Design a protein with these regions (language model features):
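Predominantly the C-terminal beta-signal and adjacent terminal strand-loop region
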Residues: 29-31, 40-51, 84-88, 105, ...
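N-terminal targeting signals for Sec/Tat export/insertion, comprising classic cleavable signal peptides
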Residues: 36-64
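Gram-negative (and chloroplast) outer-membrane scaffold detector with strong preference
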Residues: 33, 57-154, 191
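Cleavable N-terminal export/targeting peptides
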Residues: 1-26, 234-235
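Residues at beta-strand starts and edge strands
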Residues: 25, 57-59, 77, 195-197, ...
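Small side chains
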Residues: 18, 26, 36, 66, ...
Length: 235
């Protein structure tokens, strides 16, 4: 009888310790805004006709949804899906007497994966490092082509300006998608054990679509800030 009691006590303690060790695992949800600058990188077809690096910007409102697995006290791994709205503006120009500028803007549905490594510092503070990627599916946009002679535009207007719907984007670009990769580092300030404010920095890259007729394309390097709220357990 004593052996049975000892065995049951041992099992109870083991289960209690196991439950405690993984008590912080759980559902995770983040809602955030991000925004920053783009450095345009023309592809070979664009460089061959004189296009140089250009500027641009992006912004997005996304939700990250998934589960955090507690590996040990103070460290967890999150597996998160990412979806939301993204706005991207790309621009590039030639550096010649007859200056040609091309800009494009897209409103997109963003879909991707962003696994994160969560580090807890105790108390109200936490840190997360994320690496992931996905696709942006342009729903609408705008394409503009400008010509300037010695830095001036005689009539002050665009040579070509097109408002684009999804079907226009499909007929004009190949592929009609924007691939992206992203790395982020976020600081979490916890108000409770499961609610925190997020302050972050992201770096990324866009693999923008190429024009079907000319093969001209413009990729981009992105850098920016993100703010949001996190709902889920501490690491």
């Amino acid at each position: 009888m004593k052996k049975i009691k000892k065995f049951l006590l041992t099992m109870a303690m083991t289960m209690a310790l196991g439950t405690s060790a993984f008590a912080s695992s759980g559902f995770e949800f983040l809602l955030n805004w991000s925004g920053g600058l783009k450095i345009g990188i023309p592809n070979k077809a664009a460089k061959d006709i004189g296009f140089k690096k250009g500027g641009g910007f992006d912004t997005a409102i996304t939700a990250q949804i998934g589960y955090m697995f507690q590996v040990k006290d103070g460290f967890g791994i999150s597996v998160l899906g990412e979806l939301g709205y993204a706005f991207d503006y790309y621009n590039m120009e030639t550096d010649t007497a007859i200056n040609m500028g091309v800009s494009s803007m897209f409103n997109s549905f963003q879909l991707g994966l962003l696994p994160k490594f969560n580090i807890g510092f105790g108390g109200r503070h936490g840190l997360a490092i994320g690496i992931g990627g996905g696709v942006k599916i342009p729903i609408s946009g705008n394409y503009t082509l400008n010509l300037k002679l010695n830095g001036t535009n005689p009539d002050g207007s665009a040579l070509t300006q097109l408002d684009l719907k999804r079907e226009d984007i499909i007929s004009m670009y190949n592929p009609a998608l924007i691939g992206y990769i992203k790395a982020s580092i976020d600081y979490y300030l916890f108000f409770t054990d499961s609610i925190a404010m997020e302050f972050g920095l992201y770096l990324g890259g866009d693999f923008a679509p190429k024009q079907k007729d000319t093969k001209i394309g413009l990729d981009a390097f992105d850098i920016g800030l993100q703010l949001g709220f996190r709902f889920g357990p501490k690491a």
